[in-house]
């Protein structure tokens, strides 16, 4: 096993091969990575079977689905890499140019960060997404996967590096930390001088640990306590469709709805319909029904477990939905501000003034009017695959694509000027 220190030194030694690579060279490397990923399908599936067997009974079925790979999912990962090829190269982009009275010409240019560290949990697709995005944005990457997905991740990284071996980019620009202990995560948090940026992707425990302990600059990809508010002027059919998609299409992801707020004027009509759709109809279809966590007012209209205080501060990542009835738009916004992780929140309303108030007052990375929160995604936003959803305001916010993985520098051109 290569030590963490050796890996940090290896990636530092070769980072220039990617930091200054041309768009053509990077695109050739990405295509080679995608091809080798598909070619290694058999090896990756064998590794994934080991991870799945070890995880069964230890994590929920929803989380097992995040870990699971088949040939179609591997092909989708490769397709995601190829889609990055089609994205414009951000490196070298001129952001601003100005000329001073003394004749100096100042140009602000986009440049690579350098080396980016990614700490993430049991999501194999993050491995290929992170490698593709960092490479296209001119960065080397150090990956630290969760223990549950390590065998799968190792097989994926092996395939990606074999792809790089056929190009002029050194394969060591992608590093996988082999030690999955907590100490390896803390070592990355303290790797100042080796990592230029650290991005955690996972649950609240991981993200909080990184934010609280890292001395390396961090972009916080926050948890998703995502709200949908059904206003008194909502179209109920539209609301039900949005709720169904936001909660059930993929409950294990961070843009899935966790909290439903319903105006009291709508509760008596929409909540029984919601119960029919999310419980009765799903049972009839052989699907897992939604489990409700209900406040006292919501429990008057549907059956379910009484909500506890912490339910409105929980990212369930499962077929569980907390429901609260509110008396006004203002109460809904106040609730969101008290419980939000500033990820994605939505209002369903036909009232333009209510929509404007909601979008002005709710301080989240993505705020929706009459649309599912499941659109908070790099691909859906036209950014290609993403590095995560940033819930902070400094440097990057919302889905992080290529540009969010870059910095800039000033190039100052003169003709012998000196400062008086």
UniProtKB/Swiss-Prot annotation:
Enumerate the UniProt keywords alphabetically: Amino-acid biosynthesis, Cytoplasm, NADP, Oxidoreductase, Proline biosynthesis
Gene3D superfamilies, sorted:
Aldehyde Dehydrogenase, Chain A, domain 1, Aldehyde Dehydrogenase, Chain A, domain 2
Family named by the database record: Belongs to the gamma-glutamyl phosphate reductase family.
Q: Which enzyme class, named as a word?
A: oxidoreductase
- CDD domains annotated for this entry? ALDH_F18-19_ProA-GPR
Give me any GO biological process, just one.
L-proline biosynthetic process
- Show the coiled coil region(s): none
Which chemical reaction does it catalyze?
L-glutamate 5-semialdehyde + phosphate + NADP(+) = L-glutamyl 5-phosphate + NADPH + H(+)
Xref: NCBIfam families: PRK00197.1, proA
According to its UniProt entry, what is the function of this protein? Catalyzes the NADPH-dependent reduction of L-glutamate 5-phosphate into L-glutamate 5-semialdehyde and phosphate. The product spontaneously undergoes cyclization to form 1-pyrroline-5-carboxylate.
**Which InterPro entries would you find in this protein's record?**
Ald_DH/histidinol_DH, Ald_DH_C, Ald_DH_N, Aldehyde_DH_dom, G-glutamylP_reductase_CS, Glu-5-SA_DH, GPR_dom
Q: What is its EC number?
A: 1.2.1.41
Pathway this chain belongs to: Amino-acid biosynthesis; L-proline biosynthesis; L-glutamate 5-semialdehyde from L-glutamate: step 2/2
Listed GO MF terms: glutamate-5-semialdehyde dehydrogenase activity; NADP binding
Predominant localisation class: cytoplasm
Q: Which domain of life is it from?
A: Bacteria
Q: Which GO terms describe its cellular component?
A: cytoplasm
**Database matches in HAMAP family:** ProA (MF_00412)
Q: What is this protein called?
A: Gamma-glutamyl phosphate reductase
């Amino acid at each position: 096993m290569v030590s963490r220190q050796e890996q940090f030194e290896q990636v530092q030694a070769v980072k220039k091969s990617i930091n200054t690579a041309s768009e053509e060279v990077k695109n050739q490397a990405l295509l080679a990575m995608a091809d080798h990923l598909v070619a290694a399908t058999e090896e990756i599936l064998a590794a994934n079977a080991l991870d799945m067997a070890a995880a069964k009974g230890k994590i929920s079925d929803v989380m097992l689905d995040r870990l699971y790979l088949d040939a179609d999912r591997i092909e989708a990962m490769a397709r995601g890499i190829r889609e990055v090829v089609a994205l414009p190269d951000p490196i070298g982009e001129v952001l601003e140019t100005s000329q001073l009275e003394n004749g100096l010409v100042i140009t602000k240019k986009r440049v690579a960060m350098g080396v980016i560290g990614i700490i993430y949990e049991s999501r194999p697709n993050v491995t290929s997404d992170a490698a593709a995005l960092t490479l296209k944005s001119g960065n080397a990457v150090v990956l630290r996967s969760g223990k549950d997905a390590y065998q799968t991740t190792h097989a994926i990284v092996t395939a990606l590096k074999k792809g790089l071996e056929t190009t002029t980019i050194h394969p060591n620009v992608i590093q996988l930390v082999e030690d999955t202990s907590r100490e390896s995560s803390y070592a990355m948090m303290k790797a100042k001088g080796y990592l230029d940026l650290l991005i955690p992707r996972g649950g609240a425990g991981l993200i909080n640990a990184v934010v609280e302990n890292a001395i390396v600059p961090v972009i916080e990809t926050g948890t998703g306590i995502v709200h949908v508010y059904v206003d008194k002027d909502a179209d109920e059919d539209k609301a039900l469709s949005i709720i169904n998609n936001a909660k059930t299409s993929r409950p294990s992801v961070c843009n899935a709805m966790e909290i439903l707020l319903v105006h009291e004027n709508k509760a008596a009509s929409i909540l029984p319909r919601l119960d029919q759709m999310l419980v009765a109809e799903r049972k009839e279809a052989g699907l897992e029904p939604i489990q409700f966590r209900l406040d006292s007012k919501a429990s008057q209209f549907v059956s379910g477990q009484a909500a506890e205080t912490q339910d409105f501060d929980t990212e369930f990542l499962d077929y569980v939905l907390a429901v609260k009835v509110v008396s006004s738009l203002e109460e809904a916004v106040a609730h969101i501000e008290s419980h939000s992780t500033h990820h994605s929140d939505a209002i369903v309303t036909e009232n333009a003034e209510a929509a404007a108030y909601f979008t002005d007052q709710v301080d989240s990375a993505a705020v929706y009017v009459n649309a599912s929160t499941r659109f908070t995604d790099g691909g859906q936003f036209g950014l290609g695959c993403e590095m995560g959803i940033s819930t902070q305001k400094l440097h990057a916010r919302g889905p992080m694509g290529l540009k969010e993985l870059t910095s800039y520098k000033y190039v100052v051109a003169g003709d012998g000027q000196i400062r008086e």
